[in-house]
Amino acid sequence: MNDHTPDRYVTFLGIDCDAKADRMMEMLSARLASTDSPWVRYFEQKLAEKARMATDNLHFVGSQINSLYSFFEEAEDEEGLDLLWHLEHNCC
């Protein structure tokens, strides 16, 4: 590779996927706390499963990518959608 474009199939070096997944989880928590969307109950259940299975945040984001897109679209959260897109295309 001669360019500086990250190749997710070779390495995650320089992408900082874990920190970005942590940020996504912070954004999710903040959104869940400020809405009465039906998604709240769904994500509460999924987060409880995550805790029981002791999976990391990147695994959770990858497993819930479509639901997260729907939730952040419903919330009209462009920052969340942008971060989610980045995670999906560079980390998952």
Swiss-Prot record:
Key words, A-Z: Nitrogen fixation, Plasmid
Signal peptide: none
Pfam families in the record: CowN
The keyword Lyase appears for this protein: no
Any GO BP annotation: nitrogen fixation
Protein's UniProt keywords contain Cytoplasm: no
Protein family according to the UniProt entry: Belongs to the CowN family.
NCBIfam families per the UniProt record, alphabetical: N2Fix_CO_CowN
Function: Is required to sustain N(2)-dependent growth in the presence of low levels of carbon monoxide (CO). Probably acts by protecting the N(2) fixation ability of the nitrogenase complex, which is inactivated in the presence of CO.
UniProt-recorded name of the protein: N(2)-fixation sustaining protein CowN
